[in-house]
């Protein structure tokens, strides 16, 4: 009942904000209406420079009504819901993910990087950046060369995000790729290779945690998670975050 209008005493009044970056499985492609909406008045999202009540789709990088891949349910809503319930604190989501993007498009100085920095700095006028959530890598899996160069690029990207956003210990939470992605996408063995790289990076990037996607179902398109799986994935992201900060 926490999110249904019941008054609670916050442990703290600070808004905790989280930057959402990556490609479509961070933005969210789950079908709207397949899962109950999350209604929690302590969860917010950045819209037009202001905190608005959280409502999906949170990261509308694509059309909501038209096209093959529509914006929809993602992992961030259940992440925010779990955070607010655990810590009795308001949460703000900063949606900056963009479907189909490669990590090269996120490098420091790129449009996507600069947009994420700008939106986060705007958000942190009225919040504290408490973490960066990243889900990306499918776009690299068509190329052995891109997979081989991924680790260095992500390591540098995390450093750049942190240096621009004022803290080298901002938690960085990232997720595996599904190894059930349909063969029609042409990713082959590189998905498993990428997950191996992620595992190594989780040991190399300080204050980071890797999230398993084992057992999560995919939509008929063979690459995006189902709405129910996004809900579970958001909980897994939160649990990874919670374990990480409990060690600090």
What are these regions (language model features)?
Residues 1-248:
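Cell-envelope and extracellular/periplasmic
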């Amino acid at each position: 009942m926490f999110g249904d209008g019941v008054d609670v005493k916050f442990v703290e009044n600070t808004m905790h904000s989280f930057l959402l970056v990556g490609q479509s499985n961070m933005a969210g492609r789950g079908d709207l209406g397949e899962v109950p909406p999350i209604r929690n008045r302590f969860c917010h999202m950045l819209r037009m420079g202001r905190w608005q009540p959280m409502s999906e789709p949170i990261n509308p990088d694509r059309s909501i009504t038209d096209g093959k891949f529509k914006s929809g349910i993602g992992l961030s809503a259940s992440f925010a819901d779990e955070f607010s319930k655990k810590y009795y604190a308001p949460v703000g989501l900063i949606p900056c993910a963009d479907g189909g993007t490669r990590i090269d498009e996120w490098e420091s100085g790129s449009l996507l990087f600069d947009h994420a920095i700008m939106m986060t700095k705007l958000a942190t006028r009225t919040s504290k950046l408490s973490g960066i959530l990243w889900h990306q890598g499918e776009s690299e899996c068509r190329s052995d060369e891109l997979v081989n160069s991924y680790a260095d690029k992500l390591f540098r990207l995390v450093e750049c995000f942190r240096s621009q956003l004022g803290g080298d210990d901002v938690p960085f939470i990232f997720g595996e790729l599904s190894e059930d992605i349909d063969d029609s996408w042409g990713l082959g063995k590189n998905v498993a290779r990428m997950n191996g790289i992620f595992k190594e990076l989780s040991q190399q990037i300080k204050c980071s945690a890797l999230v398993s996607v084992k057992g999560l179902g995919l939509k008929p398109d063979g690459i995006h998670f189902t709405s129910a799986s996004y809900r579970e994935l958001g909980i897994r992201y939160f649990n990874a975050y919670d374990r990480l900060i409990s060690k600090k």
